Curated annotation (Swiss-Prot):
Keywords: Heme, Hydrogen peroxide, Iron, Metal-binding, Oxidoreductase, Peroxidase. The gene is katG. Belongs to the peroxidase family. Peroxidase/catalase subfamily. One of its GO terms (biological process) is cellular response to hydrogen peroxide. This is Catalase-peroxidase. It is an enzyme of class 1 (oxidoreductase). It comes from Geobacillus stearothermophilus. Homodimer or homotetramer. Pfam families: peroxidase. Residues 1-30 are annotated as: Disordered. Its cofactor is heme b.
């Protein structure tokens, strides 16, 4: 009987959900591995967020005793804990590494990664090999997070702790902007690479060409391999990797040298013994480890016995003090190649002076040799890096300033415009990488708005042209790093005015009309506002023509950026290589068009229903690239109807692929070709989830619902970058 009970307990008949990824139960993904992943459009659902719905982090941050928090962080730096003692009695280097690695995942290609959501707390980042033992840094911060609670997010705390660490060791910073809002589960939309093993590097092709949009050289690394490319200790080859990786983070050579040299002025690397002594990472650790990973059995498992990267030693003889000793060591000695006690490649100074030895991490009376990584020597043996490094060596104040500016850029690059920054230490200076936009000095009444809309509709521009231009302007927005969008009207400027997807000749014609209207108005109104207002007016007209008298909400206040305020190279990465909303694709890619559509929708911050209603509406409004007929399932182009969905789902038609990759929609009885379509169009009838939305909007009783949902989604995209509206609303509440 006892055995029978034990057997019944083991079977657990009431446990009907799949709660473990390693469960032997088969999931939909197992059956259909190529199934379109729509979950990334809903990854931050309210259900995962423990805050009340009315919680506003920016409002809570305003209640923060900011200077008291900084003082608590400063004290923490030298309050060494027995469970994880501070090297040299100072946690500063550990917190700099934590902040750096939080921000350093950012890449300009798609704006994903970075510090703005605090995802270092979650898999995979919390368990990346390059983040080994940063779990200890986060645990050291917990008493402070517990004390200040909702007034400081983890994401902000990580970066502020890095700032305080630098300042507490004599380094310079130029400020801090709060406003990073925590997420509550991993970000599944970020593509970190296709490798299935840590430190694998299957992301290269040809002449070491790194796969887009990746920036790191290997799975599980933040930047580059410190031992050299694929672990080969070649400083010149390492320089090539460094340059490409930092470029993909938006950093130039000077910023790169400043960051590497400045960061390695502090602290040490840890490789006291063989890696076989190190336990599993946090996500693989046993439950009793309580989220701590990399528990080591080597010696004490901490302090001087710590194993992290496998490289062992400090870079400088003064590892808790800002100075130029990094360059003193780099250029003052020849270096010989050896292996650390953990077996990692590193370089040691030839015959170092006693004054250039570093203190032991635990015993300051004991002196130990310093070291350099292969990536450090790249700053000496790459000609361009060497010029910059020697200049910094000879000009300490310039070096300190360059590091402070590069550090601020590193830790704030993914926060978007300056209007999002919070706190008393926000720099007054505008930086070009913040994509600055002049503030507007006008307001518009409802009557004035209606008058301008009438002028636009009577200008000779079509509904299609007005909608296309507004979409082209606004849809550059990336919710990942809060860049792009309609504010600034950079669609008038290089490089956006020349992008293929924007149909430059037609765009120039539309912009010329808007400029004429602007000149005729009795008060100054930005082109940015006119573009969005024109799109809104067109949508209203299209809805009226469909029988629905509706208003499209419009909020003026956009400014017009200048070419001088626009970094052409930086903005080039925002060019869409595919935009399924316009049925545009620059060329054939290995990724199916429907996946590119979902990726675009995710970057715009759209849900699956919003993506669906926008595609259906934009097709009938004639918003396709170069007026291509694909997916325009209507005889009433320019009228906001649900025809796209009605005809997509009509079983009187069949869908037939052609050799050109386009699909023909044929009458089942006559064989007549009625319409043509792309995979982006057909996915709304093929994918069962998207089909359910298509059926919803095709219903006879949902025609008005379709119009209203389209308008809501349209306004969401038009205002996606209007952080000033959020700020004004917040200020009106707190006034």
């Amino acid at each position: 009987m006892e055995n029978q009970n034990r057997q019944n307990a083991a079977q657990c008949p009431f446990h009907g959900s799949v709660t473990n990824q390693s469960s032997n139960r088969t999931t939909n993904k197992d059956w259909w591995p190529n199934q379109l992943n729509l979950s990334i459009l809903h990854q931050h659902d309210r259900k995962t967020n423990p805050h009340d719905e009315e919680f506003n982090y920016a409002e809570e941050f305003q209640k923060l005793d900011y200077w008291a928090l900084k003082e608590d962080l400063r004290k923490l730096m030298t309050e060494s804990q027995d469970w994880w003692p501070a090297d040299y009695g100072h946690y500063g280097p550990l917190f700099i590494r934590m902040a750096w690695h939080s921000a350093g995942t950012y890449r300009i290609g798609d704006g994903r990664g970075g510090a703005s959501t605090g995802t270092q707390r979650f898999a995979p980042l919390n368990s990346w090999p390059d983040n080994a033992n940063l779990d200890k840094a986060r645990r050291l911060l917990w008493p402070i997070k517990k004390k200040y609670g909702n007034k400081i997010s983890w994401a902000d705390l990580f970066i502020l702790a890095g700032n305080v660490a630098i300042e507490s060791m004599g380094g310079k910073t130029i400020g801090f902007g709060g406003g990073r809002v925590d997420v509550w589960h991993p970000e599944e939309d970020v593509y970190w690479g296709s490798e299935k093993e840590w430190l694998a590097s299957e992301r290269y092709s040809g002449d070491r060409e790194l796969e887009n949009p990746l920036a790191a050289v290997q799975m599980g690394l933040i930047y580059v391999n410190p031992e050299g490319p694929d672990g080969k200790p070649d400083p010149k080859a390492a320089a090539r990797d460094i340059r490409e990786t930092f470029r993909r983070m938006g950093m130039n050579d000077e910023e790169t040298v400043a960051l590497i040299a400045g960061g390695h002025t502090f602290g040490k690397a840890h490789g006291a013994g063989p890696a076989t002594h190190v336990g599993p990472e946090p996500e693989a650790a046993p439950i009793e480890a309580q989220g701590l990973g990399w528990i080591s059995s080597y010696g004490k498992g901490k302090g001087s016995d710590t194993i992290t990267s496998g490289i062992e030693g400090a870079w400088t003889p003064t590892p808790t003090q800002w100075d130029t000793s990094y360059f003193d060591m780099l250029f003052g000695y020849d270096w010989w190649l050896t292996k650390s006690p953990a077996g990692a490649w590193q370089w040691m100074a030839v015959d170092p002076d006693e004054k250039d030895l570093a203190p032991d991490a635990e015993d300051p009376s004991k002196k130990v040799p310093t070291m350099m990584m292969t990536t450090d020597l790249a700053l000496r043996f790459d000609p361009e890096y060497e010029k910059i490094a020697r200049r910094f060596h000879q000009n300490p104040e310039e070096f300190a300033e360059a590091f402070a500016r590069a550090w601020f850029k590193l830790t704030h690059r993914d926060m978007g415009p300056k209007t999002r920054y919070l706190g008393p230490e926000v720099p007054k200076e505008d930086f070009i990488w913040q994509d600055p936009i002049p503030e507007v000095d006008y307001e518009l009444t409802e009557a004035e708005i209606e008058e301008i809309k009438a002028k636009i509709l009577n200008s000779g521009l079509t509904v299609s042209e007005l909608v296309k231009t507004a979409w082209a302007s606004a849809s550059t927005f990336r919710n990942s790093d809060k860049r792009g969008g309609a504010n600034g009207a950079r669609i008038r400027l290089a490089p956006q005015k020349d992008w293929e997807v924007n149909e430059p000749e037609r765009l120039a014609k539309v912009l010329s009309v808007y400029e004429d209207i602007q000149r005729e108005l009795p008060k100054k109104v930005s082109i940015a506002d006119l573009i969005v207002l024109g799109g809104s007016a067109a949508v209203e007209k299209a809805a009226r023509d469909a029988g629905f008298d509706v208003k499209v909400p419009f909020f003026p206040g956009r400014g017009d950026a200048t070419q001088e305020q626009t970094d052409v190279e930086s903005f080039a990465v925002l060019e869409p290589f595919a935009d399924g909303f316009r049925n545009y694709q620059k060329q054939e890619y290995s990724v199916p068009p429907e996946e590119l559509l979902v990726d675009k929708a995710q970057l715009l911050g759209l849900t699956a229903p919003e993506m669906t209603v926008l595609v259906g509406g934009l097709r009938v409004l004639g918003a396709n690239y170069r007026d291509l007929p694909h997916g325009v399932f209507t005889d009433r182009i320019g009228v906001l109807t649900n025809d796209f969905f009605v005809n997509l789902l009509d079983m009187n038609y069949e869908w037939v692929p052609t050799d050109s990759g386009i699909y023909e929609i044929r009458d089942r009885k006559t064989g007549e070709v009625r319409w043509t379509a792309t995979r982006v169009d057909l996915i709304f009838g093929s994918n069962s989830i998207l089909r359910s939305y298509a059926e919803f909007y095709a219903q006879d009783d949902n025609q008005e619902k379709f119009v209203r949902d389209f308008i809501n989604a349209w306004v969401k995209v038009m205002n996606a970058d209007r952080f000033d509206l959020v700020k004004k609303a917040r200020e009106s509440v707190t006034a």
